[in-house]
Amino acid sequence: GNPPDGAPNGQPGGFGGSGEVTQGTSANTISEDTTVTGTAYTSTGDDENALRVDGAAVTLDGITVDKRAGATSNTEDGDFYGMNAALLATNGATVTIKNAAVNSSAQNGNGVFSYGSGTTVNISDSTITTSADNSGGIQTTGGGTTNAENLTVTTSGNSSAAIRSDRGGGTVNVTGGSYTSNGYNSPAVYSTAAITVKNAKLTANNSESLVIEGKNSIALENCTVSGNMSSTKGSSSSENVHTVMIYQSMSGDADVGTSEFSMTGGSLIGKNGDLFYITNTHCILTLSGVTLKNEDPDGYLLRVVGNSASHGWGTAGSNGAQVEFTADAQTLEGNILVDTISALDLTLENGSSFTGTIDIVDNAEGG
């Protein structure tokens, strides 16, 4: 079904999904085990992949994939199942991609899409560029797996996370590379999956940098992360402005449960609003040796609160957050806000320090 209005980052799509796996057509399909070198694949058709690998073990070296035109008739099918993506791996395929260039200028044309349990994409030393709305860089759904190493991923459209997941989640492992989003509602990482990123640069130039939805996770090691959410143009800017958002949307795209965020080493820079915003979920938050910087003097280090429910995130007055926050060899500076329907358990260990205040405020909805 459709997400609540204003689900951040537009990750769940609109127009009403078909409710069944609908992947459209493909200009080129590989369904037998093979190795391909230096081939160019293009698509200009609606609901059409430029290249689909269906159920086969395939190695692709030095290929180019260009989704030049053609829109989806249904953005949920594009977001959930890979319809209209430039390159789609599906039906238990194992795809190894090296030295590739993948480009998409099509609406809802995700770059490299891994769909379904048993499907694995291994991609390295490649570039992925998308320019239209609802077009993530690497997208993983339905229990698929993506392993990415040394990629340069750039997205320019709105609702186009560089590392993106959606209904059914999966597993994403990223090592090295740079991931940059330039649109609104387009974090560097949007997680409805188990996502691990090591030694990468994650930059959201007009959005929050990281989002976890529901019973899912992001684990970062030695990453350089920055976010710059718009105060007005984000789909949830009226609710809060922040750099990291952890929430439960109730759209059905992520199971309800504990969200987990961990960051070891590296840096996290927020240019607007709060550094961390957590609402309508239970969260385990762990920071270890991270350089934190909030460039907004009015922004909180951490905001743990309910929300207005105007976007469908639970019921106003009872949609607070419960956060277990462990700081390990970590310097924390800044204020923390917790409302009366939320709870924070803060543990400082291994020489950690906290300089700031913890402000307890009434829930805005009277909960």
Task: Walk through the language-model features, giving the residues of each.
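Extracellular beta-solenoid/beta-roll
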Residues: N294-D296, G312-G367
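Surface-exposed intrinsically disordered loops and tails
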Residues: G70-T72, S238, A309-G312, E365
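Beta-strand-rich solenoid/repeat architectures in extracellular/passenger domains
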Residues: G17-G19, E32-D47, V58-G82, A93-N108, ...
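Extended, small-residue-rich solenoid/repeat segments and analogous flexible loops
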Residues: G17-I30, A321
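Short consensus segments that form the blades of beta-propeller domains
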Residues: T75-G78, D253, W313-T315
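Beta-strand repeat architectures
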Residues: S31-D33, V53-V58, A89-T94, I341-L344, ...
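Disordered, low-complexity segments in secreted/periplasmic proteins that are enriched in proline
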Residues: G1-Q23, M250-G252, G312-W313, G366
